[in-house]
Amino acid sequence: MRLLERLYFPLRKPQLIQVPIRPLARPYLYRPAAAMDLSTDATERKGSVHHDTHATPPQFIQKEHWRYQSMRKADLDTDPNIFDLSKRDEFSEERKDIWRPAGIIPAAQIDAACQAYARGKPLSVPAQDAQIFEHRDFPGLQVISGLLPPETQVLFTSCLMHRDLADPGHKINLQADYDIPYPPKPTSDGLRFDSSFFLRQRSDPDDCLTPKLPDKLKSLNNEQFLYTKLRWLTLGEQYDWPTRSYAKHATPFPEDLSTLVTGLFPHIRPESGVVLMYSAKDFMPVHRDVSEQCQRALASFSVGCDGIFIMARGEDDGEGENAPRSVAIRVHSGDVVHLTGNARWAWHAMARSIPSTCPDYLANWPAGTPGSTAAEEKTYKKWKGYMGTKRINVSCRQVWD
């Protein structure tokens, strides 16, 4: 696998990545963001970001990244430096002051967005108002716990992992090295997933991904492909990992996913989505999302197992407002991290995925796929429990002004 590709998708733990040290094109300066505003122009800024896409992260955030990677699972539950916003009601007053209410997404808006995503099917359990919390010292870092209802999470996972993964127009990390026998095109554009890699046998010697350089790589059966080798999928505008830029010729962004994102966050017009698949020992290195030409906010959706998300501001030797500081957040299935203002361009990472934390309503997926026939469900049961081992993160962003 190419080194540059490996730097920006889930990696196996533990391995030290050596990257060339080069100075920033200009120092990263923290400027306090304005008050929370989810209007269309809230995240517009004059000029261009001009961040160096190959800059090296500060040492202090890399040390935090490795600290959480090596921490025992049991210690994650008691670490006082990790914020779990699903338990904010249990916070001390001091900790509550760190995460302040920054707005609400009304229940009616959530219901409407999820119903539109499900092609008009209403939620079986009406949504509740979703509180937005913003970090006091990281303006623009906002978390909405449990924004996606359980049934929407199941549909969300099905659309991504059945339909979108089976579409060769959406790139995956293995396309450069393997010839991939994609399933036939779906026969329906509704909520029927009759074209999927999960409708194949787990281990069939006649149904494999064949390497383009057979003297260097081995063939992969479907189980090896889906459980261990699949790391990322790109939707819409195709992000090029080696150059860290976007191609000029767009692949259409999934229309239903666009409807969901815009329904929840009207100020974002999603044009690209990076889907990352984490297993128990996978992590995302420290990086910044600075390749987009547009200055709009980014919405990052999580489904599956919990993860530890970290963010940093400041520099190793900075002082005052530029002093080094970091924050760690435990994100759950259904949570959304919304990055706007200066937080949109901050260093961040997914330090680890936490195994055996996927909620019961999703853990057995693809068993229980919406709209499946009896024959399809029989095949899905052979893959039962796939999502119980996975964490999927989908960051939806607008690329162009």
How should these model regions be labeled?
Residues 1-11:
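N-terminal chloroplast transit peptides
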Residues 16:
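Cationic, low-complexity basic patches in intrinsically disordered or flexible, solvent-exposed regions
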